[in-house]
Amino acid sequence: MEYNNETIILDGGLSIVLYETLVREAQRASYDHTQGKIFSDPTKVLAHAPILRNVNLKTVKAFCLSHEHSDHVDAVPFIYRELQKEGVDAPVFCTKPAIDGLKYKFQTYRIKSLPKFHSVEDSSELPKRYRAREPRYPSLFKAKIGSFTVMWVPVEHSTLNAYSLAVLLPKKGDRKRMVFYSGDFKLDQKEGRPPMHTIRELGEDHEALLICETIGVKSLGMTGVEDLMTEKLEEYLTNLDKRLILVAIRSTEVPRIHAFEIMATKLGRRIGLVGTYMTKAYEAMRKSFPGILRGDYKIFVMSKKNVKRGVQWLGDLQPKDYRKYLLLAEARMWQTYSTDFHQIMKTAAPLPQDEKHKACMPTDEELTKTGKLEIGKDDIVIFSTTDPYTEKMRICKMHVERHVKASKALFYPGLHISGHGQICDYRLLMEALKPKVVIPFHREKLDRDLLQKNVLGYLEPTPQFFNPQTNGTTYEWTA
């Protein structure tokens, strides 16, 4: 967002498909680091980051991030690299898990220059030049960045440290304006996240423009709290005697992983982290949440070349030892066929060699190098991840189900609590905030349209609705 020739960036993520393309390219060895060449086709990133086309990069003052998930932070290294070309060294304000994760991303993408990171969880560490003099809303972390006063409002999500951002604009006469960026959120009144009284106060004090997510806008009611995950696991797995327990899960969903840690302990098993990505993310999260993630774990890698002391190749795990572990493999929802979980299923339960299954067939390299598990009727495969919402993801899910059917393992696709609000969550947020303007983000145009139909249509007065039609569309808030 831009004001008075100053710009702050509210989150900067990559789509999962683009993310995986870039990771594969980053891991290739054909780089000329002396020329600063990172990716052979940087237009892939530029196309996904319209800010690089529509904003004068010299005006960027900072990145302000809501939480550490890839679709909110993974473009930051690339945008930061472009800023540096313009002589701009923008700091990053975010949570400690996001700091740990981003440092790893910079390393993964082989971008050597790091920005200055500022944690939004400890105001005492904030440099004086960024300390806001806003006495209101004492419970919120605040930073003064150029003309903006940015406040981090705690919300519930599928990670333990997630925030909405309230950005106060300079007062003009009697007019006080605020941009409220929801980030990914749901309401959890049990924990008081978000603090609705503070949001109500913000709405009463300011004329608000709301930038709102739309992932749960098709679903009636409210999303369940994270504690339900532990209850569902205990109810389902306690008396279920299975040899192998393989879980497909996103590696950054701390509450879910914590629930599986608790369950593993009750079953007398160790957590088995499958793959480099799951391991790196887990260990970063463990560092960020030392009082939460603390179970005993073992690392398994998908390739023999990554074996080192204390790390075992998955292919060397013997069936007689399956009962020792509860295996967690990276799935990143249903988007692609190249996650560690998909590699396991491709080799453990190959599908018929035909065009119908071509996308999910293992390559020769996967068949020879990937650690192959023996999966059968005495085992269970659990999907603890978001339901598919695009056609490609639905096809991917269909192939996954065929793999599991081919393996004859028990399949449980429903051990998941969404990290996103539903229609009632959105309505309660907007009733408290009373925005003048609403701009949707996330997903397809249909879902953004549903936000207007299912939520805004019930508000009095009805806010103005601006639905961006293409990436890079700008909205000028003047009235």
Where are these regions (language model features)?
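Short helix-loop-beta junction
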Residues: 108-112, 401-410
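Generic beta-strand/beta-sheet core signal
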Residues: 11, 95, 182, 213, ...
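His/Asp/Glu-rich metal-coordinating catalytic cores
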Residues: 1-62, 69-266, 270-274, 280-283, ...
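A generic structural motif
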Residues: 115-136, 271-283, 294-309, 386-387, ...
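Hard-cation-handling environments
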Residues: 222-378, 382, 406-407, 425, ...
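Active-site-proximal loop/helix segments of hydrolase catalytic cores
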Residues: 10, 156-163, 168-229, 336-376, ...
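Internal alpha/beta domain cores that form substrate/cofactor-binding pockets in large enzymes
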Residues: 411-479
